[in-house]
Amino acid sequence: MKKIIAIFTVFIMISATMISCKKDEKTTINFLNWGENIAEGLIDEFEEKYNIKVNEVFVDDNEAMYQELTSGKTQYDVAVPGDYMVERLISEGRLEALDKQNIPNWTELLSSNLNKSFDPGNVYSLPYMNGTIGIIYNTELISEDINSWSDMWNPKYKDEIFVLDSQRDAIGMALKYLGYPLNSTDEVELSAAKAALIEQKKLGTIYGADNVKDLMISGERAIAMIWSGEGLTLADEYDYLKYIVPKEGANLWIDSLVIPKGTKNKSAAETFINFLCEKDSAYRVAEEIGYTTPHEGAMMEQDEEVRNNPGAYMPEEIMNRCESYKYLNEEELLKYEKVWLEVKS
């Protein structure tokens, strides 16, 4: 009898230990993100609060993100693709539909950032952060007010112009300058954009990316095409620099939170997305990263100077002229690549 009791006691102890271990075991979600795209300490706080571990992996652009998501090497649970990549992933059936009952904070997002053409009704995505591509200029070197893409072609600024070394962005700038749609695939319009970029090169224009900061701070370049986060941060730190969104409009991009198809941790992924949609989380991301927030409450927490800065939160008439990138199919992409090759050669 004692032997039976002893065995039964050991069985209970082992069972209790197994249950305890299972309870303490953390769910792990894989988060595919851009580098420096989340507020410091935010993931640690989420892990502590929800007992869910976040394994963060970084990529540099949408194409690299697509490769990661489709390679089959890692099953990601949450990712942050840009607008046109969201559209592509949806069209290929690579995203899970969101259960918004598990993401109640989505109702606090600004309506102006919802129901976009790349995901009508936000069935598969919710906005995480947004921004524009505009112009930064040195007010000590340029006395006039800059307000148009045409200023990037002004002969007065010969040897002072900087353009992002990005096929889609540079061609998009030229299309907006000429009054054409940002996503045009029309042969005539693309040919005109190519001619405009070649003319711009004759003004001593240089192409680059990260070096724009140093060139603008030092005064080696007086006017540049730049991402709004970098532009607004530089303008905040250096009084002689100013960031604007041109009157013709620009690329209005939205990085969105999505759940890749095949996740085994959908509930945990939605918990994480809901956490990132909280006011405090959204505010901290906007303050640290420098881009504008799609969260209404977080926006209202920002300094009045930020809220009233047209480079950050644009006037409605300029906002209405802004466009998001659309996904280009292989044939359309080849047209852009041909234009870009001829511009850069």
What are these regions (language model features)?
Residues K22-L89:
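Early extracytoplasmic/lumenal segment of secretory-pathway proteins
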Residues G134-L141, K176-G179, W253-K266, R284-E288:
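A bilobed periplasmic-binding-protein/Venus flytrap-type ligand-binding module shared by bacterial periplasmic
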Residues L190-E199, Y238-K261:
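Periplasmic-binding protein-like
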Residues E316-S345:
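Conserved C-terminal helix/tail region of periplasmic/extracytoplasmic solute-binding proteins
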Residues M1-I29:
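Short, low-complexity disordered leader/linker segments with a strong preference
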Residues M85-R88, I217, I223-Y240:
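A ligand-binding cleft/hinge motif common to bilobed small-molecule-binding domains
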Residues A39, Q75, A79-E220:
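Extracytoplasmic ligand-binding site segments that recognize negatively charged/polar headgroups
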Residues P260-N320:
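Mature extracytoplasmic/periplasmic domains
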